UniProtKB/Swiss-Prot annotation:
Keywords: DNA-directed RNA polymerase, Nucleotidyltransferase, Transcription, Transferase, Virion. It is found in: Virion. Its EC number is 2.7.7.6. GO terms for biological process: viral transcription. One of its GO terms (cellular component) is DNA-directed RNA polymerase complex. It comes from Sheeppox virus (strain KS-1). This is DNA-directed RNA polymerase 35 kDa subunit. InterPro entries: DNA-dir_RNA_pol_35kDa_poxviral (IPR005059).
Amino acid sequence: SFESIIPFIVTAPLGRLTFYVEHYPWIDFKSHMKEILDFLEGSLVSDVHSHKLETSVLDNSTSSSYNPVSGMLFVNDLLTMTVVNFFGCNSRLNSYHRFDMTKLDINTFLKALADAFKKIANYLEV
C-alpha cells in the first residue's frame, strides 16, 4: 500500500521513463495524466529558460561552468548535462569535457522536448 503526499513521481532509471501516479475512481485518469505532462513540460521549459551557465573561471566550482577560451565545460547539474548531451557532448556529472558551446541551439532543444511530450501523450492516449 503506497502512501504519499506527492500526487505523482516521475523517474527515468537507465532512460526508461516511469510514472507513479495515484489513481482514484473519481478522477478522470486521462485528463489527470494530461495535466501532469503539461506541468512537467512547463517546468522543464521554465528551467531551460532560467538556466545560467557560469562563464568566469572559478576554482573549486560547485556549479556547471564553461571557459570560452579553452572550450572546457564543467558539468555539475542534470540540466546542463542533458542539454549538452542532446547536442553530442556525451558528458557525465562532476566532470570536464571539451565542447563547442556554439553547437547549442536552445530552440532546437525546446522543439525536441515539445515533440517528446507529444509522443508521450499520444502513447498514453491522453
